[in-house]
Amino acid sequence: MADSVSLWLPAAVSVAGAVSGFAVWSRPVVLKVWVLAASLASFALLLMFPGAATGPSVVMLLPVAAFLSLLGQPAHEDNRAAWILTLLLLGLGLSLLAAHDGLGLILLALLLIVMVALLYRYRALSVSHLWQGIGMYGFGVVCAVVALTAPAPVSMVAVLAVCAILLPLAPLHGGYIAALAGLPGNLPAFLACLLPVLGLHTLTAALPRLPGDALGALPALGLVGAAYGALKALAQSRVRALLAYANLSFFSMLWWYVATVRTVPPQAVLYLAATGLATNGLLLSWYAIRARYGDMDLRAIRGLAHPMPRFAVLFALLILAALGLPPFGVFAGFMGLLLTPGLPLSGALAVIVLAWLAASWYLLDLLQRLLFGGHRPDLRYEDLRRTEFAALLAIVLILIVMGLAPTRVFQPGAPIAPAQVAGGLAWNR
């Protein structure tokens, strides 16, 4: 009971903070302070209550990612809706992690419905995969209903499809791409952490009960997704779409690993958490550019290293973290995956290495395009503001701590009751 309360209470605080935020809707500065306080309170409650995680588990990542994504936003009225939605999604995500029995699947369906509504509401901002994303999340709602009503093994295959939508795996990745490439404000940065965490949580719970045929097909899908995501990222000229496809490639590697070893060890959780947080930082960095100059094509802006030195240093560090270089968390997680005793590599290793080399190409190319080259005389350059700098610096420091911390502290689902991990969201009939 204490384990559930330790998540339900922070979830309730997040939702209450979102609802009460409408009382100060007309004052953006006050509203920003309010949502920051609500996300910080959720994090504090996870630490204070018995049954909460005592170490840097993946559950703790959610309020931290929400807080930092909110902190990096300017106090402008155009960002208010995204702030409120961040708290609502945080509350929904924590509720899903705490839920047992069929309630977990109901909350999953609710989350997917919210994603459909958000993509449709902000369809004018989307530049790619809008209807594919709406259709994919709608398909996820159908799968959640099937998982609630159908017998095994059909229900477990439906749950697996929902996992592949949240933790992106080709060919069910369209919703994730659309969310990161088309939603406003800090929402893409927060969702880059939230959706994969919920997907891995659901997969961890369902893994022992998945049909053998479905589980046997996942390693091949993971390798195909890693290669496909890398090739698509190479072809992108817009930053958010590039980062979304990069994440598809990185998370497909995680799918390959989990399906091969048929468990979710701490190094897999570390890899997911660090990858999501690095993407969070890169998306916040790009938002700082968009807030100044609009949603530009990569070819339209360059040469930021000299006029924006604080941005340049932090952006370069985040690129190195996302590439999996030491001492950042992605490196520790990725090396932990590859060095697992008894892991069959053979031909799969070649695909993983090629996908990682492709990541080195397109991420370093992104770094080179933005930071180096000639200045545009028609642009007024402005370096990071204090809140933007603080948010990005905190992300870099957390990634370093994740890389240096013992891997064992990243136990999957640390604050969740053991019975929930064994029985999943407990779709027992």
Annotate each predicted stretch with a short phrase.
Residues 1-429:
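Alpha-helical transmembrane segments of multi-pass membrane proteins predominantly involved
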